[in-house]
Each structure stands twice: as structure tokens, then as C-alpha cells.
Amino acid sequence: PTMIFGDLCDHNISKFIRMFDKLPIMPEIDHGAGPIQPVNARDLGQAYYKAATHGSLPQLEYICWGERPVTVHELCALIGKYLGKKTRFVSFPMGFGVFLAKVLKAVTFGKKDYVEKMLRLGEDRSFSHEAASRDFGYVPDSFNEGLKREVEEYMKHGK
């Protein structure tokens, strides 16, 4: 999985939560249309346990993603809702975002390189976990509930 979440040390969704809490306006690329499918660390732990204790499995490699795909925009809107903040978005085209990332990289002599991160915002990062569900009963928890727990943890401990 490319985006694991579940606590304030995840370096993924926790960064979005902090940004949302600090910024009055949230920038997004191409209206936040890029699909992602974050997986909760708890779900991965259960998947590893189920796979390890299942006995023989028909394949050696499984994709274990979160419950469902969400767009980056939906993710950010949910974070705003759970933080109790009015959500304001400003959308930029992908090309402009990549241009700004390249300028930042140039003026910092390569110390700040966000070009790849910018490009990833437009990638489809959603995949099926059908084989894991079929072969060893992988059923991820609700994405919304997992996100809500992480925002509540932030509000309690992370500010």
C-alpha cells in the first residue's frame, strides 16, 4: 500500500490533518480528483495475522487496501468536517503545480523536492483487495470511521 494511516505518526493523512487545521484555504490539484485508497494500519495488522494463520494460500502476494477509493477532495472535505472547520479549496491545474514544485526545487538547490509528490496527486492509487477478501477473509474497517478516529486523536493529543 502507498498510503497507510491510523495514528499521528503515519506521515500521510496526519499531514493533511495538520495542514487543514493550520491553513484557512486548502490548495488542491485538478479539483482533488485523484483517487486514493488509504489503508488503516489496524486493517493491515489483521490482514497479516489472518494470512499468517490461515495455512496455505493460493498466492504469495496480496493487495490489502482500505475499504474504498476516495478522491483527495473527499478526503480533505471529511477532515474539515471532522475538525469542525469550514472547508475552502483553491484548485490549480497539475501542470501549474508541477511548475511551482520545480521552481521550489531550483531555488532551494534541490533541498525541497516536491515534484514527485505533486505528480502522485494525479495518479489513480486505488486497487481491488478482492483476492485477499476471498482467500483469507480480509475486510477493512470503514474509511470514514478510521479517519474520524485519527482526527479525534489529533484534536486530543496532536495540537
Feature-to-residue mapping (PLM):
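Conserved beta-strand termini and adjacent loop/short-helix elements that scaffold enzyme active sites
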Residues: 1, 31, 90-92
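A secondary-structure boundary/capping signal
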Residues: 1, 65-66, 123
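Conserved beta-loop-beta element that borders a ligand/cofactor-binding pocket
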Residues: 1-7
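Conserved loop-to-helix N-cap of the C-terminal "lid" that shapes the substrate pocket in Rossmann-like
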Residues: 7-10, 32, 37-45, 61, ...
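Low-complexity, charge- and small-residue-enriched intrinsically disordered regions
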Residues: 13, 25-41, 103-126
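A conserved pocket-lining segment of Rossmann-fold NAD(P)-dependent short-chain dehydrogenase/reductase
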Residues: 18-39, 47-51, 55-56, 63
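Mid/C-terminal beta-alpha module of Rossmann-like enzyme folds, strongest
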Residues: 50-113, 129, 135-159
